[in-house]
Amino acid sequence: MKRAFLYSLMLLAIFVNGVSAQGDKPSPQLKSAIDNLEKTIVTKPGLVPLGSLATLDLQPGSCFVPPESTREFMTALGNKFSGEILGMIIPGSKDEWALDIMIVLESSPSGHILDADANKLDANVILESIRSRTEAANVERKKLNQGELKVLGWDEPPYYDQPKRLLVWSINTVDFDNAASINYNQNMLGRDTLLRMVALGRVDNSKIKQFAKKAATHISYNPGKRYEDYQPGVDKVAEYGLAALIAGVAAKKLGFFALLFALLVKGW
């Protein structure tokens, strides 16, 4: 069943990225990526290191794709990364797993992000900024013969869980073929690093968010990497606050993941 699912994914990837030199087969790069994903996936519950930055307590009902396999898989599907890929969480067990929900974990050396503007987040202003940036990115997508992406509005407006140092938002989008999707973002602030958790899928939105929220509760920064470990005068401070973080990351990640996944999920 797993192999059959992955083969269907390969066929969909042809639609996204075009065919190989043989004309009707997925590229060798994609085949290799899928093989490695299947070979390296972690299905046993327990502690999983996310580099030296954080730790995932993998729960029953969830599987983990290591960073190398995640990077190879996403690169084969046309994605480019600005941060460090830490891995991917998907639902399943050792007997059966699927890619109907994907949580991509990525870290970025942002510097220490001050949260002083947490109570001043203006969802309307931020949304207009995201739309403006997305429209500008659409111009570049046209040049690359890629479909445009339209931002409909908030699925969940931004909110900040101060005790957890967790910044969350979710955006409703529509791709060029009118395929609707959400882009559910959870951003965990650390000492000088941002840990991003971007969840997408083909199932009901509430199931995507439920799975993503549960996964986030089992990820924690390692000692020395936590927000409260910040040392003034020693650690770099980010040049932006929470509002600018949302607008910048959201616009970039919409083009980074959402358009691709909106295409991939058709027919799953």
Predicted regions, residues:
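Bacterial N-terminal signal peptides
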Residues: 7-16
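Positively charged n-region of N-terminal signal peptides that target proteins for export
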Residues: 1-4
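N-terminal targeting sequences that direct proteins away from the cytosol to non-cytosolic compartments
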Residues: 20-268
